[in-house]
Amino acid sequence: MAVDVLLGLQWGDEGKGKVVDVLAPKYDYVARFQGGPNAGHTLIFDGHKVVLHQIPSGVFRSNITNLIGNGLVLDVIALFEKEIDKLEAFKLNLNKNLFISKKAALILPSHVELDKAYEAAKGAGKIGSTLRGIGPTYTDKVSRHGLRVGDILSPDFMDKYNKLVDQHKQILDFHKHDYSEMKEREDLFFKYIDRLRKMNLVDSEYFINDAIQSKKTILAEGAQGSLLDIDFGSYPFVTSSSTMVAGACTGLGIAPKHIGNVFGIFKAYCTRVGSGPFPTELHDAVGEEIRKQGNEFGSTTGRPRRCGWLDLPALKYACMINGVSHLLMMKADVLNAFEELQVCTHYKLGNGDIVDTLPYDMCTNDLTPVYKTLKGWNQDLSNCETFDSLPQALLDYSAFIEAELGLPITLISIGPDRKETLIKDFSFITA
């Protein structure tokens, strides 16, 4: 059975958590394959709003097995305090349906301090880190001296921990960074490490491949967005992991031949949190209105998101590098109040060239979006229950995007609740 992959096509915050929750009944397994507590997947259902950071978004479906894969970096404090303990109110049986890879990297308290020190040292060149210790943890992983979840089962775990933290303290001292409060976080860290030992810790590559061989339906849930990918994003303003479909293979331990559908999620407009290039960003009242209507504030940091019009060259690029098979358009309702919409179809470079491809360096200021004006629907969508009941202007907007990208839009979200999701045809999901 194939593994379907769901990932963001922009700079994150596209609405992946909601879509996973909507599509989850079609799957036996939901597996996260990269990122960590820097991601925030928001689910709204039955009057509840829940933000998941590390736990897969299928956790609210009792018949679904959820896996935190080897590609994640795990913050055990946040895992328990912000997720597991808060989920107790929903009476979920996490002992039955949540599994954690032994190969997932551990975020140590000293990693968080390193993140703060590195970001402060960059001065005006800050990349907008969430300061959750993600980058330093991935750095230790790549340099082959990080700690992994499986290490907590080893009798020499404390020796490994102390050795690594001593190295971190040398770096922190070099940066003259005050880490006097780290001890308090360490106490919490070890408290939750003891709880983590009692969780379902598995050799996830065998776990997921056994599920494939048993013909189970599997959805790989990405975090952040393709334009934040460490290799193909707007470098250096990127995250530290592979946010692409290829990351599902390395972050779960599955062969490329097992990849099935690739669902690419995008907002009907664009947003970005933190620093970095954003060609269609709006600095006017229109941008403020989009932020207001979309409640565009980071689910992890609370920072206001930068807002702008839809960027087709960037979207086309993300579809190409991921081999997207189906497009899912989110937050169409945010644009309800606009009589006209702008869509970026090309970029004008500083030398006058007009292109529809992403330049090597998007961080230069000589890139101007070229827009096409489309008619807005300028009406409320709350009474729309099917694709056919959507206003013609929204259907035209959708059709224009489909024609430009050469891919079908099979889902349109018209509100935050799981019920406010219109699916053209469920047959596109693996049966």
UniProtKB/Swiss-Prot annotation:
GO MF entry, a single one:
GTP binding
Residues reported in the UniProt entry to bind Mg(2+): D13, G40
- UniProt entry tagged with the keyword DNA damage: no
The alphabetical list of record keywords is: Cytoplasm, GTP-binding, Ligase, Magnesium, Metal-binding, Nucleotide-binding, Purine biosynthesis
The cofactors required by this protein are: Mg(2+)
Give me the comment on cofactor binding.
Answer: Binds 1 Mg(2+) ion per subunit.
Q: Name one Pfam family in it.
A: Adenylsucc_synt
Q: In which pathway does it act?
A: Purine metabolism; AMP biosynthesis via de novo pathway; AMP from IMP: step 1/2
Q: Which residues bind IMP?
A: D13, E14, G15, K16, N38, A39, G40, H41, T130, R144, Q224, T239, R303
Q: What is its EC number?
A: 6.3.4.4
Can you tell me which residues form the catalytic site? D13 (proton acceptor), H41 (proton donor)
What are the binding positions for substrate in this chain?
Answer: S299, T300, T301, G302, R303, P304, R305
Gene Ontology BP annotations: 'de novo' AMP biosynthetic process; IMP metabolic process
Source taxon at top rank: Bacteria
Function in brief: Plays an important role in the de novo pathway of purine nucleotide biosynthesis. Catalyzes the first committed step in the biosynthesis of AMP from IMP.
Q: Which family does it belong to?
A: Belongs to the adenylosuccinate synthetase family.
Listed under subunit, the entry gives: Homodimer.
Put simply, this protein is called: Adenylosuccinate synthetase
Q: Which organism is it from?
A: Cytophaga hutchinsonii (strain ATCC 33406 / DSM 1761 / CIP 103989 / NBRC 15051 / NCIMB 9469 / D465)
Q: What is the lineage of its organism?
A: Bacteria, Pseudomonadati, Bacteroidota, Cytophagia, Cytophagales
Gene encoding it? Answer: purA
